[in-house]
């Protein structure tokens, strides 16, 4: 498969920015291969560090925390190191546990993600980072559906809009009114970092 050019990683590497990416096996490809436009390997070996945390081979509803604790620890550790200007992670819990349809497990899974995000935000305050929080689709947000008057468990992805949250204790960022999608995330990131976006990109949200 041909990879797509003008990815965010290419722009960051061209600017000499060091990056860190982490997730567990279930979503590792989403912060590496898919993130880089279907590119196997790194754009620049000297600037990028990828870390995969092996997922447990167990039904997700039996271990809904998944590897959220380990992902959080790796993020905080690398934020504290000061080695990276741009870091990214993916928590698979809402999607993978959401597919099981087991409500109690889904609630606990999202509590684990909440706990992880709390630690990352605290680290951002301590080490001077801005945090962006978003998703590529929903699942855990809609666990039931009603058809012909009958309510049943829903295990598929939802079609609800996803959030885009900017957390920055030192700066105020205003998201402009508009209809946005994932294609607007990279332009927003480079603008916030003071970089120039490729002309082929969509508009920044700020």
Tell me the role of every PLM-derived stretch.
Residues 1-206:
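Feature captures the catalytic ectodomains and active-site-proximal regions of enzymes
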């Amino acid at each position: 498969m041909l990879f797509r050019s003008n990815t965010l990683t290419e722009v960051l590497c061209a600017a000499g920015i060091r990056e860190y990416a982490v997730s567990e096996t279930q979503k590792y490809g989403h912060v590496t291969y898919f993130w880089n436009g279907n590119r196997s390997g790194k754009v620049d070996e000297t600037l990028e560090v990828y870390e995969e945390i092996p997922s447990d081979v167990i039904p997700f509803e039996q271990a809904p925390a998944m590897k959220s604790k380990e992902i959080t620890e790796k993020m905080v550790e690398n934020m504290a190191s000061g080695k990276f200007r741009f870091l990214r992670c993916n928590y698979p819990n809402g999607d993978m546990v959401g597919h099981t349809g087991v409500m109690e497990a889904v609630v606990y899974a999202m509590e684990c993600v909440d706990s992880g995000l709390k630690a990352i935000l605290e680290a951002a305050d301590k080490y001077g980072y801005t945090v962006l929080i978003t998703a590529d689709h929903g699942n855990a947000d809609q666990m039931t559906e009603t058809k012909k008057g009958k309510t049943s468990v829903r295990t598929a992805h939802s079609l609800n809009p996803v959030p885009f949250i900017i957390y920055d204790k030192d700066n105020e960022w205003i998201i402009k009114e508009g209809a946005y999608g994932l294609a607007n995330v990279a332009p927003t990131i480079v603008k916030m970092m003071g970089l120039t976006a490729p002309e082929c990109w969509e508009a920044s949200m700020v």
